[in-house]
UniProtKB/Swiss-Prot annotation:
Coiled coil: none annotated. PANTHER family: 50S RIBOSOMAL PROTEIN L3, LARGE RIBOSOMAL SUBUNIT PROTEIN UL3C. The keyword ATP-binding does not apply. The modification N5-methylglutamine is found at Q153. One of the primary rRNA binding proteins, it binds directly near the 3'-end of the 23S rRNA, where it nucleates assembly of the 50S subunit. Methylated by PrmB. PROSITE patterns: RIBOSOMAL_L3. SUPFAM superfamilies: Translation proteins. This is Large ribosomal subunit protein uL3. One of its GO terms (molecular function) is rRNA binding.
C-alpha cells in the first residue's frame, strides 16, 4: 500500500490535446489532508498514516473525536481515512502536518475509490444485463422477468449467489489505472483521465496504483 489523498469529486469535463483529440477528464478537489495520527509497528502492530479533510460543525463532533483531533492539533474534519504505508513513506511525516496535491505528478497512474451512485431496487435486466424475453410470439407480461431460477426436480432449489433482482449501486467501487492529466497546486485540484465512481460532491480516495 501507499499513501494517498482524500478529495471530493467536482464533476467531469474535457480537455484537448495538442493533436486536437478530446479527452474526458474528472476534476477532483483536494483540500489539504491533515495528519491526525501516525501508527507504527511498536504501538499499533502496523504502519499507517491517518488523515482528515474538510470541516465539520463542532456540534456534530463527538467528545472522543474532539479529544483525538485536539491531541493532533488539527481542526475537526468531515471524515477520517487511513493509508497503510512503509517505513520509508513515514519519513518526513508528522502529526499535525498536511499532505497536498503535490504528492502526485502529471502522468502518474492512480487508483480512485468512491461510493457508487445508488440506483435503488432494480430488475435483472438493468442490474445484471440479462437479455429480455421475446417482445411478441405469444409472450405477455414476462418481457423483462428472469425466467427459471431453480431448475426442476434436480436440484429443485435456487443456488446461493444466484443473480436476481435487488438493490443496485451505493457500494464501494475502485477504478484502477487512471492517468493524472493535471496537478494544480494553487487551486488544490487534480485532473484525472476518465470517469471515477460516485456522484458530484462525493468523497473519493486517490492513491498510487497497485498494478504499476
Amino acid at each position: 500500500m501507499a499513501i494517498g489523498l482524500v478529495g471530493r469529486k467536482c464533476g467531469m469535463t474535457r480537455i484537448f490535446t495538442d493533436a486536437g483529440v478530446s479527452v474526458p477528464v474528472t476534476v477532483i478537489e483536494v483540500d489539504p489532508n491533515r495528519i491526525t495520527q501516525i501508527k507504527t509497528l511498536e504501538t499499533d502492530g502496523y504502519q499507517a498514516v491517518q488523515v482528515t479533510t474538510g470541516e465539520r460543525r463542532e456540534s456534530r463532533v463527538t467528545n472522543a473525536q474532539k479529544g483525538h483531533f485536539a491531541k493532533a492539533g488539527v481542526a475537526a474534519g468531515r471524515l477520517v481515512k487511513e493509508f497503510r504505508v512503509t517505513e520509508a513513506e513515514l519519513e518526513g511525516r508528522e502529526v499535525g502536518g498536511t499532505i497536498g496535491v503535490d504528492l502526485f505528478t502529471v502522468g502518474q497512474i492512480v487508483d480512485v475509490t468512491g461510493q457508487s451512485k445508488g440506483k435503488g431496487f432494480q430488475g435483472g435486466v438493468k442490474r445484471w444485463n440479462f437479455r429480455t424475453q421475446d417482445a411478441t410470439h405469444g409472450n405477455s407480461v414476462s418481457h423483462r422477468v428472469l425466467g427459471s431460477t431453480g431448475q426442476n426436480q434436480t436440484p429443485g432449489r435456487v443456488f446461493k449467489g444466484k443473480k436476481m433482482a435487488g438493490h443496485l449501486g451505493d457500494e464501494r467501487v475502485t477504478v484502477q489505472g487512471l492517468e493524472i492529466v493535471s496537478v494544480d497546486t494553487e487551486r488544490s485540484v487534480l485532473v484525472v483521465k476518465g470517469a471515477i465512481p460516485g456522484a458530484t460532491g462525493g468523497d473519493v480516495i486517490v492513491r498510487p496504483t497497485i498494478k504499476a
